[in-house]
Amino acid sequence: MASTLPPQTWEAGYARPADQASWEAETNYVAESGERAHWMLPVHTEPPTSTIGNGLGLTHLRTWPSIYDGTATGKPEWFKPSKEVDVLICGAGPFGLELGLILARQGISFRIVDKANAPCLSGRADGVHPRALEQLHAWGLAHEVSEEGPILNSTVLFRNGVKLFHGFSSTCDSRYKGIHIITQGQMERIYIRDLLRHQIVVERGTTVQHFNVQSTSQDHPVRATLKNVATGEEEVVRARYLIGADGAASSIREQLGVEFDGITTDIYWAIMDCRFKTDYPHILGFNIIISAEHGGSIVIPREDGYTRFYTQINGEKARKLQANRQARRNASTVGETRIDDHGITPDEVLEQLNKIIAPHKVEFASPMSWFSVWRVSERVARHFSSPDLRVHLGGDAAVLGAFGLNSSIYDAANLGWKLGLVLRKHAEPSILTTYDKERRLFANRVIRCSGAYLRFICNSSLPLAALRDLGEHLESHDENLPLLDGSTEADREFLYTFFKRHAMFLLGVEWPIVNSAICPADTKVRASSLRNGVRAPNPRVCLATDYTAYLYDKMMGVGRFHLLLFGSDLQGPVRQRLAVLAGELRKREGFYERFGGREMFNLILVVKTLSHQTAELLEGDLAPLKDHATTVYDDRAPDDDAHYWYGVNHARGALVVVRPDLAVGVSVWPEEIGKLNKYFASFLLECEETLPTKKSLLARLWDAL
């Protein structure tokens, strides 16, 4: 929400205005006997949501410090942080909080510290991709996030008064379809409440003063000194891993000595969240309005009648901002990105906006919810992980320029399960090398893709940032930059080629593929049409006679592999292939039991039978599937069922291994047990209880003789 909501009542069964909110009434906490309720109303405050207002003032947003501000309001009685933890997270922005959510769900011990005394209250990030919501769904949080604000349904693009595009916004086959609007502050509050349920409190006003990694043979090789900003008190904490989630000017990244490749531009954007009065006809959709003379503007509809305007600052105003920036001393190697002493007022930005949007007019219709000025920086850390794999970077500490909130979700989803498996002694530490490889190539594409589009909106001929590949060489690419020759034909051609190439990437459902142990190279003949490493599709299925949903609804959690076994109608030639896999499930030395059983594998049987037919068909040679698998019913028409989405041969079936981050690992025929063993043995550790003892090993040798 952009401001404190007025009092409401639900006495009629729906929300409507009230004179007073019942939670505020003293009588709501006293019994008829006069005895007071045991539960006490927490202290709340209503701070302003912006440091700078407009002529109508500032909005305020009610917040609850004892819920959201962590140790800044005191430590709960039950909170007793350990001096030895599995993971120490430096930074409680989106990435740090998201990684914490994943670790908490795996029972991993961690502490999370942040130098700020409170989370983000308003503004900053403005939307989440469908793919990001799919990750949040696996964590159990997507419904809350997706229902906060509107979804972007329409897109309008004007350049120099010419309408280049007016139509539906890009969508994909995800259940979440398109971009959902929500601010960073709303997201952080959702995350913090979740961590409280897991007995985790953000330690506020605290920094990692310095750290070192001692002998990696030690159980907790990371030694970090925490410092309380207010008192100066220091504490030494030991951890197995350290996470740099401390933003663009990351002290963890700088202590590691990791280069932050890229450029800091002289392109400035002012951002205003407010209610506006305007005669511009497309205010309720996503808009890009470009003036070759005055710059660009981006319009994003928000919740409760608010709108966000991004307005490019150019000309004399930009030179003034540049002078202010240069007058400040800044020790960060990145330079300033957010400009706090703006040197420009909301009224001046509104004046600039009206020049861009002319002949239409825009006026403030409410106090300011959020105002900020940002300088565009396009950077990617040269390495996301330290050579010893004990320190990892994510979020803005790793990539800066675009996709910030969404990239943080993808970073956390990628790193979280790998860290969890290593710490739970299910995987080799070498699996952590794949985090840097997979996420860094994604980050490079983010910077190239968003950079090209930014130059189109801002009418800039600035070259794209030069970034490293997975080695030490500059990455080669074929990203097209706009011609900017003033012709409508060139503009339309750029937009056509840009969105043809990047539409699905901009929704998060497509990304660069990096081959590794967890994502082996594709073979010419595959059991599924899906390529290794891509997003696992999420078709509709039937879960029970009276319940339909999506396949992902049976793929919840963060620390297990999902084994999707496609069995057609369980009859004919596919049955004997399924029987081979079913027999493997019973073997103690088989891959399923050897690498963790139910703790590591979520086996889902996808069948083309109806529920009343299935029980009998799962007798006999397929009986182990009934004991080990969750059955879902693929009863949609052949042109829209899960077998079609996954490209499965009904006579042969398929087993698709889906990683905990919902990407395809590998697909095999159901009878290819050797390939499954080889795949999992390349990075997983055998469970101790399944390892043969010396006695049993000798017994086997004796039997062999």
Swiss-Prot record:
Superkingdom assignment: Eukaryota
Pathway stated in the Swiss-Prot or TrEMBL entry: Secondary metabolite biosynthesis
Binding site for FAD: 86-115, 208, 308-310, 408
Induction of synthesis: Expression is induced by the azasperpyranone cluster A-specific transcription factor ATEG_03638 which is itself regulated by the azasperpyranone transcriptional regulator ATEG_07667.
Technological use: Azasperpyranones display potential anti-cancer activities. Azasperpyranones A, C, D, and F exhibit potent growth-inhibitory activity against the A549, HepG2, HCT-116, and HL-60 cell lines, with IC(50) values of 2.39-14.42 mm, respectively. Moreover, azasperpyranone D significantly inhibits HCT-116 xenograft tumor growth in BALB/c-nu mice. In addition, azasperpyranones A and C can bind with four kinds of therapeutic targets for cancer, eEF2K, FGFR, survivin, and TNF-a.
Cofactor names: FAD
Function description: FAD-dependent monooxygenase; part of the cluster A that mediates the biosynthesis of azasperpyranones, members of the azaphilone family that exhibit anti-cancer activities. Azasperpyranones are synthesized by 2 clusters, A and B. Cluster A is responsible for the production of the polyhydric phenol moiety while the azaphilonoid scaffold is produced by the cluster B. The non-reducing polyketide synthase ATEG_03629 produces 5-methyl orsellinic acid, which is then reduced to 5-methyl orsellinic aldehyde by the NRPS-like protein ATEG_03630.
Protein name: FAD-dependent monooxygenase ATEG_03635
